[in-house]
């Protein structure tokens, strides 16, 4: 029997990415306290949260594969979250200007039959152009990236902020490492092709 697929996320970006592989899935809101633990590294944080999200859906029935994902952005060795305000978005982009920032994306696939989770972390680097405050403000006013870690949307005008991108899968930057997910699903017996 083929496993049913659940995305433990309410993110429209993750739903859109997952729909690219043309498998039927349902999206469920995970129950997860996303507060970092004291002295927790970015990698440990995102893998812990991805696995917690995948395990938090309360599905006891066998034959489900539940996908959990979490992402943080690190600027100058400091974890930054979603800015939520214009002022904070401008501040984050000023800190990123001319620097490399790193996104860590945790991905977990929980198998409800075996009660086992396969969890990884994928890294993606973004090299920012040297930006003026005016360029940053123009970008923030046009795209309003208040609910995006790092204060940009790479799938939109945010691409103009970058000098180069470095990573295995560009989907990782948006929040769901699709190439790795396909490998993980196939390992669980769910073939995409």
From Swiss-Prot:
Sample GO molecular function, one term: nucleoside triphosphate diphosphatase activity
SUPFAM superfamilies: ITPase-like
Location within or outside the cell: Cytoplasm
InterPro entries reported for this sequence: ITPase-like_fam, Maf-like
NCBIfam families: maf (TIGR00172)
Record function comment: Nucleoside triphosphate pyrophosphatase that hydrolyzes 7-methyl-GTP (m(7)GTP). May have a dual role in cell division arrest and in preventing the incorporation of modified nucleotides into cellular nucleic acids.
Protein name: 7-methyl-GTP pyrophosphatase
Lineage, broadest ranks: Bacteria, Pseudomonadati, Pseudomonadota, Gammaproteobacteria, Vibrionales
